[in-house]
Amino acid sequence: MTALNRFVKWKTAAFAAVAVATLASTPALAGNDNDEFQFDLVSSAAFLPHAHGRVNIESVGPVEIMSVTVWGLPPNTDFDFFVIQVPKAPFGLSWYQGDIETNRYGVGFERFVGRFNIETFIVAPGPAPAPTPHLDQPFPDASSNLATAPVHTYHLGLWFNSPKDAEKAGGKPNVVTPFNGEHNAGVQVLNTSNFPDLQGPLSRVKPTP
């Protein structure tokens, strides 16, 4: 490893430690201005009681920028991040937002751009054929959708990408969920159950002109 690489790794670790300490001491729901909103993610896995996260959503007109920091998680582990209808099972309608990978300190960060506000919803005016690239059990793709009126999805959840990683961290063995790209994820570890089911945090974000 070169001196430059060592310096970059040291700076990254130091920044992560400072960021976590700062976030942990910042009151929840405190935004910097009217266009920002901050809130916590809380542990949903009993075997990881110290897992935590902080979300900052900044409204910038046509889109929002959602910055997610998580800590207290297993190091060097992949997780999958979803926007969901309700924070706990059965979760309702859900859509795959992206991945978060922790570093060797169990800290992860990712930034997402999209619509994350009171207007966030899923709609299916009618049934239609759907592609089926993933057919493995226990959660094969559906070949068509059900019709639904607009359903708002105001909650967030984070899942282990691998059931084996969840088991290694102390979870029950062989628990598989559909919450990753191949539909063979582990259990949920963080969510927004600190908000009511029908009043998830995204409902408090108003789009800016």
Pin down the residues of each PLM region:
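N-terminal signal peptide c-region/cleavage motif recognized by signal peptidases
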Residues: 25-27
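Intrinsic disorder/low-complexity signature
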Residues: 2, 29-30
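Bacterial N-terminal signal peptides that target proteins for export
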Residues: 2-14
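Hydrophobic helical h-region of N-terminal Sec-dependent signal peptides
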Residues: 12-23
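N-terminal leader/targeting pre-sequences
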Residues: 30-209
